Amino acid sequence: MSAHRDAIRTARSVVVKIGTTALTTPTGVFDTSRLQDLADAIEARMKAGSDVVIVSSGAIAAGIEPLGLTKRPTDLATKQAAASVGQVALVNTWSSAFGRYHRTVGQVLLTAHDISMRVQHTNAQRTLDRLRALHAVAIVNENDTVATNEIRFGDNDRLSALVAHLVGADALILLSDVDGLYDSDPRKGNARFIPEVDGPDDLEGVTAGRGSHLGTGGMVSKLSSALLAADAGVPVLLAAASDAAAALDGASVGTVFAPRKERMSARRFWVRYAAEASGALTLDDGAVKAVVRQRRSLLPAGITALSGRFYGGDVVELRNQDATMVARGVVAYDAAELATMLGRSTSDLPAEMRRPAVHADDLVAV
């Protein structure tokens, strides 16, 4: 067993993401028996001493039958209505499943926007931490009634990676209808299974297939989220929900994504991945080198242009002359104020404007 698999096996704090297809029949009907089986596997892991936070998809699927619909809706309003009805059924089923073990569950509805805002980010973190301290099982889902982008893309994959870092998890386990990563679509034959991803070189030549019609995620979404979590320092296991018990027990199933050696700080993770960028700064070549290679602060002299309506304390993208993002950071000035400082050396500026435009401590290269 590799060191990374062993780290997942022994992790004290685990986030388990469960996709829509893991909770439905092949025809898209919400399947309570599948959820109960997953709860049994998760209970075994918790009984062994791990804290587990569940990120559960399936609200829209769970709302189809109660609303008398014959298939998953395609229009946004009906999706949101189905999510509203289905979320009740979803959480009640989780509550019943864990009630057999005398455990209490708590519902936490989030959107990517919630996590992008620093105050909401902190509140969500505090709530999840307190639920775990009170020995309740947190059931996290995206708030589909308002999160229009999340309904269309991701199936909670990205949210699970954000939650894993939010709660300081030691491991992230992604469970769906795929048993791991392949170098091409396994449904077409001749695909090579990839048991472990240690870095970008292992993904050379990999082509991700499309997702299932029952959910909104796909291999592209799962791969992106796994790499996000791994880059932040969290080991990831991608496995089939049918292998949930084995995956949670540390068996050699699925694909493991090795984490970076040093875990990213909460603030740097928020700047890099969670925060929404409010604008962009275009840098000259010298500033790009200073920011990316030398990890130095960005001075107004190195900025050639800006865009967006941002204020001091907002996160902005830093771009090179080809408009490629090279870093993200927390800007110190409002857009209107910074516009008067572009290209000017620090010595030419008034004393109150001699702070860096973006301090090195608030910069994350991408």
Curated annotation (Swiss-Prot):
Listed GO biological process terms: L-proline biosynthetic process
Q: Which UniProt keywords apply?
A: Amino-acid biosynthesis, ATP-binding, Cytoplasm, Kinase, Nucleotide-binding, Proline biosynthesis, Transferase
Matching entries from InterPro entries are given as: AceGlu_kinase-like_sf, Asp/Glu/Uridylate_kinase, G5K_ProB, Glu/AcGlu_kinase, Glu_5kinase, Glu_5kinase/COase_Synthase, Glutamate_5-kinase_CS, PUA
Report domain PUA positions: 278-356
GO cellular component labels = cytosol
According to the UniProt entry, its GO molecular function terms are: ATP binding; glutamate 5-kinase activity; RNA binding
* Protein name (Swiss-Prot/TrEMBL): Glutamate 5-kinase
Q: Which organism is it from?
A: Mycolicibacterium vanbaalenii (strain DSM 7251 / JCM 13017 / BCRC 16820 / KCTC 9966 / NRRL B-24157 / PYR-1)
Question: Lineage of this protein's species?
Answer: Bacteria, Bacillati, Actinomycetota, Actinomycetes, Mycobacteriales
